[in-house]
Amino acid sequence: MVLQGPMSQESISVGTQVRLLQQPSYLKTADAMSMLRPPDLIDAGEIGQVVALKALEQVAVRFRRGTFLLELKQLETL
């Protein structure tokens, strides 16, 4: 596994494949009315696809069990 270095919103775009580095303490859905979800819906190392760029270094990532808002520091590009 090769880390690409610190990610920024300039280095990532919609459609980029990313891997979750570690399981967060909770998940926030990327719906219009967000909800907090338990962290066991996705596992560390799971691969997802960026579907939207958000403010404050956050991205919406689609995994097999849902689309969630995550900080860039929690992800690595593939």
Give short role names for the model-derived ranges.
Residues 2-78:
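Basic/aromatic-rich interaction segments and small domains that mediate binding to polyanionic partners
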